[in-house]
Amino acid sequence: IGDCVMDFRKYSLKELVNNVKTKKVSAKEMTEAAINNISKYDKTLNAFCAVNFDDALKQAEHVDSLINKGEDPGMLAGLPIGVKDLEDAKGFVTSYGSELHINDEPAQEDSILVKRMKNQGCIVLGKTNTPEFGYKGKTDNVPFGTTKNPWNLDYSPGGSSGGTAAAIASGMIPMGTASDGGGSIRIPAALSGLAGIKTSQGRIPIESNKPPGSGVLTVKGLLANSTEDNAMALDEIGR
């Protein structure tokens, strides 16, 4: 891994994807930058509760190979993301921020949301922290500890999608998954200076055996730096 560090807050998703598709920067280079960001900043912020950088680099190399062969890498090609730890991502334990689940077997397949994001070229770096079962507006738990707000380390980034929010607001990654029943996207967006929307029911399907929180009240969605970024991604994964 090189020593480049990219502040993803300075670029729109459209700019990042265009740079990858036009080979101004490779998906692997962008993933390396995100890895360096996490290695540099996450010891302080505690936004991620699990990472797999080797697999992320393999995903990025696959995106680059599609581009080099003239094939479609997806509308979100090369974007490094975090997955909220209420959501299945293949190879990672879905712990729900709970001691009850930290020793569960790793997920054997991606959730519908994660699968759609990967199909559009996103690179999964790891799982982002959440309060136990996503049931409060502050992100802390017993297994992984407290996530801090990058704008002021004495404050919370909110919850329950606080790990994703802290990772984006610090510039470590440009986008990540989230979910919202009683404010779990909207609260972190407000407290961390991001764009978040509680999507309509069914916009992004929820697996019947894997509700991400408050049952029928909860929907899946994203956090990003701008409304434009959020709209661009939702247009692709919420069809």
List where the protein language model places each region:
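Immediate post-signal peptide segment of exported/extracytoplasmic ligand-binding proteins
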Residues: V63-P80, D229
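Conserved hydrophobic residue
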Residues: V25-S26, D72, I173
